[in-house]
């Protein structure tokens, strides 16, 4: 009798593990669909602000990279 109850508990534990494995992707999909439902496209004003910010960032990174290159060219020739 004790053996039958042990097998029943093992089966319950394995069912719980399977439920936990299945629950994670289902929860992920549910939360993802809720997030996408809340999202909206930016209006023209917001879009232009984003484009300006990204453009300024590209220009700033380019200027910094160019300045670093200008500094390292003479240093490279002094070392070599």
From Swiss-Prot:
Molecular function terms from GO: protein transmembrane transporter activity; structural molecule activity
BP terms from Gene Ontology: post-translational protein targeting to membrane, translocation; SRP-dependent cotranslational protein targeting to membrane; SRP-dependent cotranslational protein targeting to membrane, translocation
Major site of localization recorded for this protein: endoplasmic reticulum
Residues that span the membrane, as ranges: 47-75
Domain of life of the source: Eukaryota
InterPro entries the UniProt entry points to: Prot_translocase_SecE_dom_sf, Translocase_Sec61-g, Translocase_SecE/Sec61-g
Subcellular location: Endoplasmic reticulum membrane
Keyword Metal-binding among UniProt keywords: no
Regions of this protein lying in the Cytoplasmic compartment: 1-46
Similarity section: Belongs to the SecE/SEC61-gamma family.
Reported function: Part of the Sec61 complex, which is the major component of channel-forming translocon complex that mediates protein translocation across the endoplasmic reticulum (ER). The functional states of the translocon complex include co- and post-translational ER import, cotranslational membrane protein integration and retrograde transport of misfolded proteins out of the ER. In the cotranslational pathway, ribosomes synthesizing presecretory proteins are targeted to the translocon by the cytosolic signal recognition particle (SRP) and its ER-localized receptor.
NCBIfam families reported for this sequence: secE_euk_arch (TIGR00327)
Protein name: Protein transport protein SSS1
Organism: Saccharomyces cerevisiae (strain ATCC 204508 / S288c) (Baker's yeast)
């Amino acid at each position: 009798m004790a053996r039958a109850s042990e097998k029943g508990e093992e089966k319950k534990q394995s069912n719980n593990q399977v439920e936990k494995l299945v629950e994670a992707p289902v929860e992920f999909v549910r939360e993802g669909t809720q997030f996408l439902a809340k999202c909206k496209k930016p209006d023209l004003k917001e879009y232009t602000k984003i484009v300006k910010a990204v453009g300024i960032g590209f220009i700033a990174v380019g200027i910094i990279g160019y300045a670093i290159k200008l500094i390292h060219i003479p240093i490279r020739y002094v070392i070599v």
